[in-house]
């Protein structure tokens, strides 16, 4: 069993964990950053999800470090991929959901580049494929976090720990009180909170499907199990069949048509979609 003694231990290597590591290393602290997957970067890398940003991100509403990250993503395309585009608001993937859609490997490259100087000076240690499995406490104080990686246990001791995991993995391990879902008005005093708390009111998990259209081909497979059920299934809150080109508007909940190909009249290529694309692209 190995061991690490550092000023700050960050468990979870998503964007938040990386940002915390950079801030601490810039202050001269010794830091260890652990990540349970093969890559740091969290949703932007391992899950392939573009940054979910507000419409004014190009003008205001971002930290200096996040602005630097965004610039480096765009610069990577110009420098490495030889993209000839002087637009400061370059959207490499030309996606709808973000003004900076890009290949997950680019974020991985950018984050590793930002962290490398501190790794070379010995201020930072990064452990991937490292999962927290046990927490040792003395009273209310966390004394050590045990990480499992490749069948080996590593103990990490630090005066300060940051839980930057996707789902708060250290909370149950450390037996720290926590809640899930949506709190009630009585819990928080928020006027728009639920009347009663709902522990299951959380953001849904998303499974991404990669699809390719090949004109003229026929690629229909035999009907899988429960095909008929899912073909015809319509949830109570849905305006049409779940697997169709109709879905509720995210704000008004009105029925909205979608289009698969450019030139269609449904979202995102129809009139309202075109306006949204223009808004997101600045």
Short names for language-model regions:
Residues 5-7, 27-30, 121-124, 154, ...:
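Loop/turn elements at helix/coil->beta-strand transitions in domains of secreted/extracellular proteins
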Residues 17:
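N-terminal Rossmann-fold NAD(P) dinucleotide-binding loop
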Residues 24:
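Aromatic pocket-lining residues of Rossmann-like dinucleotide-binding sites
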Residues 45, 128-129, 139-141, 149-160, ...:
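Flavin (FAD/FMN)-binding glycine-rich loop and adjacent Rossmann-like elements that form
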Residues 2-14:
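Beta1/beta-strand and adjacent pyrophosphate-binding region of the FAD-binding site
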Residues 29-30, 35-130, 134, 203-206:
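Conserved N-terminal/central alpha/beta ligand/cofactor-binding core
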Residues 2-4, 30, 137-140, 146:
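Residue-level recognition of alpha-helix boundary/capping or hinge positions
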């Amino acid at each position: 069993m190995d061991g690490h003694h550092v000023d700050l231990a960050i468990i979870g290597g998503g964007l938040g964990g990386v940002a915390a590591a950079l801030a601490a290393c810039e202050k001269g602290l010794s830091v260890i950053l652990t990540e349970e997957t093969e890559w740091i970067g969290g949703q932007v890398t391992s899950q392939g999800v573009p940054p979910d940003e507000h419409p004014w991100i190009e003008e205001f509403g971002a930290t200096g470090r996040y602005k630097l990250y965004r610039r480096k993503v765009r610069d990577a395309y110009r420098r490495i991929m030889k993209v000839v585009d002087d637009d400061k608001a370059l959207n490499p993937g030309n996606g709808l959901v973000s003004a900076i859609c890009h290949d997950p490997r680019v974020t991985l490259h950018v984050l590793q580049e930002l962290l490398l100087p501190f790794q070379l000076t010995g201020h930072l240690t990064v452990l991937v494929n490292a999962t927290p499995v046990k927490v040792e406490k003395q009273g209310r104080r966390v004394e050590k976090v045990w990480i499992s990686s490749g069948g080996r246990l590593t103990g990490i001791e630090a005066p300060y720990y940051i839980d930057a995991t996707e789902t708060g993995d250290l909370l149950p391990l450390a037996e720290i009180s926590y809640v899930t879902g949506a709190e009630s008005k009585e819990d928080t005093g928020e006027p728009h909170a639920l009347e009663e708390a709902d522990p299951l009111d959380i953001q849904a998990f998303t499974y991404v499907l990669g699809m390719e259209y090949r004109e003229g081909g026929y690629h229909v497979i035999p009907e899988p199990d429960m095909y008929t059920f899912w073909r015809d299934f319509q949830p109570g809150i849905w305006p049409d069949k779940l697997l169709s080109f109709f879905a509720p508007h995210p704000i008004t909940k009105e029925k909205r048509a979608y289009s698969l190909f450019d030139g269609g009249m449904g979202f995102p290529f129809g009139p309202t979609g075109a306006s949204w694309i223009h808004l997101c692209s600045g």
